Amino acid sequence: MRLNCFILTVLLAVSCHGTAGTDMPEWRWPDKEEPAFVEPYPAITNLGWTNVTGAYSTLPEGIGIYRSPETLDGNKVIAYIAVADLSKVAWDVRSIDDPTIQGTTDPLKTPAEYYKETSAPVIVNGGYFFAEGGKRYNASVAVSGGRTYGVNINYASKDWVTMYYPTRGVFYEKDGARQTGWTYWSGGAKHYLYDAPARNSWSKDPLPVPDASFPVTAVDFAPETAIGGGPVLLKGGKVENTWEAEMFYGDGADDKMPEARHPRTAIGVTKDGLLILFVCEGRGMTDGVAGMTFAEEAAALQSLGCVEALNLDGGGSSCLLVEGKETIKVSDGSQRAVGSVVLLKKR
């Protein structure tokens, strides 16, 4: 036993002597360097927009968030865009269920409530809506997974004696293509899509009720995903801004709405297929920031490379959430409950 202990002691001594005072070997391989950040969309940052994607921690690959420069065309602005590579992320719509403008008891929800339900990384308010007699109504197209949840309202009147039948704007996806157009729902089985609007005006007599051949030859409207609103801002790379033809405003104070600055929301697509969700702050929530006119909104989206773009519900409805956090200050002071939202999600 004593012999074994002696041998063990000698071995330990030799071992310690062999390493005492000897430095550990140097690491022969350099530490791996983090790759340098490469801006994915320099055409956007070259316009003065700032990439703020790094402020968010859980965005899936394919989504970028950008903040506008302090001014656009001399106008003080606060605007944000979400840029989506649709090969990596998808866009979708959530809405109350009112496919025939008959109303529903479905509740309106704030974007934050939609976020709580979906955990979608990006959510923006969608189309027009209204509430009356204890029911909620869609006034704009809403389609998800090929199922219709809302149609564009198909009538307009100032006195409920003279009736107009406007075609109103839509942004839709079908067979991998995303574009704008104008729709009319007949009140029955027919839902028409047009490449041009009926050129109605409050200052003129009503045009005929849209059908398969008026205002231009129609196709059946059967998209996979769609959101309505209006006016159409861009089509085929050109500014449209068809607010008068779509009959959003009539006599009175609202006449100035298209040319006044307000919070705005829009959806568009570039010639390279990037989806852009746009929102701008307004109504003095930040000192000196009034918002944008339709024309200014169209110009901003065109400068960002959009070739198709649709204005969505704005004003107090305008709200863009990223990871559930507000970007602009909403003009109602708190988020408005809305009828529909557009969201981005990982494919």
Describe every region a protein language model picked out.
Residues 2-9:
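Sec-dependent signal peptide recognition
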Residues 77-81, 168, 228-230, 261-266, ...:
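Short glycine-rich loop/turn motifs
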Residues 85-88, 131-132, 172-179, 234-237, ...:
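Short acidic-glycine loop/turn motifs at beta-strand connectors
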Residues 133-161, 242-244, 248-308, 317-347:
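Conserved, well-ordered active-site substructure
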